[in-house]
Regions:
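Bacterial N-terminal signal peptides that target proteins for export
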Residues: 1-8
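Bacterial N-terminal signal peptides
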Residues: 9-16
Length: 443
């Protein structure tokens, strides 16, 4: 069975690569002004793994400018690993482009562009610059702390972003990079300003080792515990997709005791015991008989997550994926990375690394369909991929991910690996979940 799955992925990637060893096989926006005089959007992506912030930014921007064809970017997205000093990265970018709208944050272990999967012990940096006659960007941010709650920070960030765009009304879509831990409250604050019908897409900033070193970037500001957003106003087509991609299993129950991000009971029974039974002991079975201590189950639980089972206003059933983080063996509770409430129905899911990798093709394809965008029409994409699912994929398979994304959308893109994902589900609205991937495409 495993060999068959490996063969499927090999055939899929091979078919994508056939006939496209040269980038000219599909047209990129900004690639040839002479061939298409109707181009209104120029996009360049660059990257670097050079040591030192100055050299890394210089190399990444040099590559980015090739796609911009002499246009000065109005907006830049920057994703990087925490191996770099993020403040110095921001300062170097702004030296090249004073006053540019700058948005981004830190990524777990690597970053993505159409050129590949970029990782190094020196650090990895990716930038995407955009100049467009049909898109207006506004970046805003806020710190979470004594002066602002997470909800207030979300409200302040989107208010500033709209102001910096210089336009009134609701944006067409919002990008978000937040500090892990308060995502639902931040989304609520954003929705207080723009309503619940504007899609919000992005992910929680990450580091390499879950040590709290993550950063969020909003123009010239760098936060450790904050939120950065981009308000996008455009007449161009927008497509998006947001999914975990796991298989839905038969085991399900109702949360009967919970608090915040901890599940104490499912169907009136200790949550850990129920989860252990559902997974046939595959996640933490060897610790199941212990009655004290805490067991971290992140790695194994990646293949056996839970999901909130939600019925939307469209009467369709949707699944909001939950990553179990640890088990408290004393009270048999499970700590997770999303807010949970009594009465919510949860269901077991299951996945393999092959399924998680193949999302690099299926999710972008759904986004193109959603936006009614043809591959040749795509200007650019922003890709979000859960860091936990990345780490579940063997290292020697990870470089297939940008091949799948790039050949599916046929355009420049930038990607980051996150500690939580936010996106819009039709019939449900904007949600925070785990172990998901998403993409926004514009064309």
């Amino acid at each position: 069975m495993r060999a068959a799955r490996n063969l499927i992925i090999t055939l899929l990637v091979s078919s994508l690569l056939c006939g496209c060893t040269q980038t000219e096989q599909f047209k990129l926006y900004g690639e040839s002004e002479e061939e298409n005089t109707n181009i209104s959007t120029w996009v360049g992506c660059g990257w670097s793994t050079k040591p030192g912030e100055k050299d890394a930014v210089s190399e990444a921007i040099s590559i980015m400018e090739e796609g911009l064809k002499g246009k000065k970017p109005e907006y830049i997205i920057a994703f990087m690993t925490v191996d770099y000093n993020v403040t110095e990265i921001v300062e170097e970018i702004l030296k090249h482009y004073p006053g540019v709208q700058l948005y981004g944050g830190t990524s777990c272990t690597a970053v993505l562009t159409k050129d590949g999967y970029h990782t190094s012990t020196n650090g990895a940096l990716a930038v995407m610059g955009i100049y467009s006659e049909n898109i207006t960007f506004g970046v805003g941010g806020a710190e979470i702390g004594d002066e602002k709650s997470a909800r207030e920070a979300g409200r302040a960030a989107i208010t500033e972003a709209i102001s910096n765009a210089g336009l009134d009304g609701k944006p067409d879509i919002v990008l978000i990079t937040a500090s892990p831990g308060h995502e639902e409250e931040i989304l609520s604050g954003i929705e207080e300003v723009i309503g619940e019908d504007v899609p919000v897409f992005g992910g929680s900033a990450a580091d390499n080792t879950i040590e709290g070193k993550w950063k969020q970037i909003a123009n010239d500001r760098v936060y450790s515990n904050g939120v950065s957003v981009t308000a996008i106003f455009t007449s161009m087509k927008i497509g998006y997709a947001f999914e975990s991609g796991y298989l839905i299993m038969e085991k399900e129950g109702v949360i009967t005791k919970s608090s915040g991000r901890r599940i104490y009971e499912i169907d009136g029974k200790p949550a850990a015991d129920v989860y252990n039974e559902w997974t046939s002991g595959k996640v933490f079975g060897k610790y199941a008989n212990q009655t004290s201590g805490k067991v971290t189950i992140l790695a194994n639980a990646t293949f056996y997550p839970l999901a909130k089972k939600v019925v939307g206003v469209d009467n369709k059933t949707h699944y909001i994926s939950i990553h179990p983080e640890s088990v408290n063996l004393s009270d048999r509770s499970i700590s997770v990375f999303v807010n949970v409430s009594d009465g919510e129905r949860v269901q077991l899911m299951h996945g393999t690394w092959e399924i998680l990798l193949n999302r690099g093709q299926t999710t972008p394809a759904k986004a193109l369909e959603k936006g009614n965008i043809e591959k040749g029409e795509t200007a650019f994409g922003i890709y979000i991929f859960c860091a936990g699912t990345l780490l579940a994929i063997p290292e020697n398979e990870r470089d297939k991910l940008p091949l799948l994304v790039g050949q599916t959308i046929g355009a420049p893109f930038i990607g980051t690996f996150t500690f939580g994902e936010q996106g819009f589900i039709e019939g449900v609205g904007n949600v925070h979940e785990n172990l998901a991937n998403s993409i926004v495409v514009v064309g």
